[in-house]
Amino acid sequence: CLYNDAVWVTNVQEAVQEVVSKHSAMMNPRIGLIGHQKDQSSYYLRLFPQWESVDVENHHALSATPLREGYLLGQMPAQDVLPQGTVNLLQNFQSQEVYHSLREEARFIQQYKQAWDVAPYTPTFVTVDAVVVQSGHILLVERKARPGKGLFALPGGFVDQGETLINACIRELREETRLKVPEPVLHGSLKGQRVFDDPYRSARGRTITHAFMFDLKPDTSLPKVKGGDDAKSAFWLPLSALQPERLFEDHFHIIRAMTGMY
């Protein structure tokens, strides 16, 4: 549960307790959390003080990130670092259409980052996202181009020079959805704002997004919308129909955090 460690920790505790209760008759069984403290991303290993923590050294400098990035760019990992069964699975997956789509996405990300190699500093991007809800529905768009081509996303984008965050959010909302709700009504429906800044939330690089929550007045019909600009289409989706694998980057978690679904 990105952006809500308490929920994630609770889920892990409950899952471990369920397994322990089935396989151990001891009142106080010993539970060990075994992992490698690689960097800041390993902070979760410190979230369970009730269990014994066992730190292990890195094994032969293996890391999943370069293996995964290389594979998505068409390179098979060396067979001496993976079990043969895993190698077979990865080779078979390369023949599927979904792999080719992932490879094109990885190439786009690689080229995107290379375009910033000449910058004197590693860039930090600032974006905005509109979380618009009405009558149990969320307003989404289908992305027209990479990254995330074909995925559902919140209306949003980069902040232009000389505009405030809220103005950027409303501009992107109108450009991508053609939402006809008057601007004064949008301002009156603004229920919250939150920064989402997980360092790894975007494959493009360090991207900090400011999400604005608009809770429109309930009605028997939803406002008409139409995809525009970077959006192939715009539509209303019941909140109960959200599927994390269909949403771009961390937008599923942003929606859950902003709407109180956690």
Model-identified regions with their sequence ranges:
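Nudix hydrolase/Nudix homology domain
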Residues: 73-107, 149, 205, 209-262
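Active-site segment of metal-dependent pyrophosphate-handling enzymes
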Residues: 133, 170, 178-222
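Short catalytic/ligand-binding loop motif for oxyanion handling, primarily in non-cytosolic enzymes
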Residues: 40-44, 62-64, 147-150, 202-204, ...
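Nucleotidyltransferase catalytic core that binds NTPs
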Residues: 1-111
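Short histidine-centered catalytic/ligand-binding loop motif
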Residues: 152-163
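N-terminal strand-loop-strand
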Residues: 110-154, 181
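Hydrophobic alpha-helical positions that pack around
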Residues: 155, 169, 173
